[in-house]
Amino acid sequence: MSTLQLKETKVPSVQFVGDDDVLSHILDREGGTKLKKEKAQLLVNPQKVIKKADCELEKSDLEVLEDQNYVKVLGRNIQESLGNGSAKDGRNKVYSFQQRKHPEEMTKLALELAKTSGKKDPLDSNDPEITKNIAQKSKGHSTSEKAPLVNNNKTEFLSTQPHNLRKRIIASRSHYDSESEYSASSSEDDEEATKDEEEDTNVARLSQKSQGQNRLLPAPVSKETLPKKKKRDKASDLVEEYFEAHSSSKVLTSDRTLQRLRRARVDQKTLHNLLRKFVPSFSAEIERLNQQHEKLFHKWMLQLHLGFNIVLYGLGSKRDLLEKFRTTMLQDSIHVVINGYFPGVSVKSILNSITEDVLSHVGTFQSVLDQRDWIINRFKEDSSLELFLLIHNLDSQMLRGDNSQQILGQLSSLHNVYLIASIDHLNAPLMWDHAKQSLYNWLWYETTTYSPYTEETSYENSLLVKQSGSLPLSSLIHVLRSLTPNARGIFRLLMKFQLDNQDSPSYIGLSFQDFYQQCREAFLVNSDLTLRAQLTEFRDHKLIRTKKGTDGVEYLLIPVDSGILADFLEKEEEEA
């Protein structure tokens, strides 16, 4: 009995099952669990689906079909496509993302878009199949891979961008890219931004794709902040480099000067002999150039007699050229040569040479202006008198004064006085205004000689030449002009006292107390401290020298030649 019962239990029972039950049983047994664990939802490639559409459909029909079926196909038949794609084709690998917190947002979005488009919504939010498909779609949302969906050799059409909205989509995308280089929104912010747009689902899908790609980029940074940060970093680097460059306390100025050369300085005569032995490599060219200038001598003589005066300019010393003109053309004429580069030259010395050597006048004049008027009247009275004035360096330091140029211009304006001069300074024409230009009545000649300024620079201070120790007149004038009027008055008192006692053999200088008393009486100082401060400045410029006598008294002395001091006083009186 027990054996029969066991056999009866082992007999299989037969039951009729439908095709749907068989299909669900196969999916549960073979791929159902794997689908839930390993596979994520495959995204739909609208472009590939459209390419597999019926060839008989035209482009315009496809666009109408896409506009009409966009909401209908949203969320439908996703489960079937997943089953086909995962079971049959193993090449489509999709990586799953975390489940969204609000999976029903896509359904609400579809309903709102259907209402705004004015079409009847074919979707029902209460349909469990639609809700399930949309939820699965939100879980498997990805833009990395796209695959076509095939179900029983039937192609399902999904929507693409409508033709009439294509331009607006491109414009919105370009505007979006111009506003921000990177996207800073999360998945929840993307859904909220999609609800705010509510213009077209294609625009929403396009923004979702761009946002999904931008999630792989680094932290969001605004375009406007990047240049500011770069500028700040660059400015900070420049500041650091500046302080690093100036952090060293070492002085980089070199002290290798000519004074460090332990060689005895030569005198002026030895220097002249050395310079004469030097022969330039282009001496033949210089000789030809001088010959061209010498051909103009007769022309210059003609223009001088026509009432013009001649000024020579150009690179190089013109002393030899004027000397050649004097020896060639002025042998039988009365002429006076004036070396303007000489430190002791002045208008007074020029007028003295004319009155004493040319006009043979014996006597003195009250002022330089009286002497000038006497010379002008003498040449006007005797028209047979002719005088040639040759001035080297008319623009020298001693002759460039306004009074000196005015007197020389008045002499050159006489019809029987002929002037030929040379200038070397670049700004020499600035000495003459329109009035002086009309007095001189210049004819300009460019006479470049390329000769060295040997004689012109022989009276200047040099580190190579040993000087006598006394200041030349030009240096004395230059130093005193830089002082205050009180300082010049103090120095003038000491200079007059020294000139008055220059013939005394026992003169050793002016004592400090006597000098202070004279300055106090002239209202130049009010205390001995002020006088000592001024004497310190004179001592720095090497204008005075102090020494103590046998009685311990301090004496003051000017280490300048008496002739230079006398010329300086005359020049001061002329300018006064």
Swiss-Prot record:
The subcellular location is: Nucleus
Supply the InterPro entries for this chain. Answer: ORC2 (IPR007220), RecA-like_ORC2 (IPR056772), WHD_ORC2 (IPR056773)
Tell me the segments the record calls region Disordered. Answer: 112-233
Involved in LRWD1-binding repeat segments: 1-100
Where this protein primarily resides, as one coarse class? nucleus
Q: Which family does it belong to?
A: Belongs to the ORC2 family.
What is said about its interaction partners and assembly? Component of ORC, a complex composed of at least 6 subunits: ORC1, ORC2, ORC3, ORC4, ORC5 and ORC6. ORC is regulated in a cell-cycle dependent manner. It is sequentially assembled at the exit from anaphase of mitosis and disassembled as cells enter S phase. Interacts with DBF4. Interacts with MCM10. Interacts with LRWD1 throughout the cell cycle; this interaction, which occurs only with non-ubiquitinated form of LRWD1, prevents LRWD1 ubiquitination and hence stabilizes the protein. Interacts with POLQ.
The name under which this protein is listed is: Origin recognition complex subunit 2
Q: Which organism is it from?
A: Mus musculus
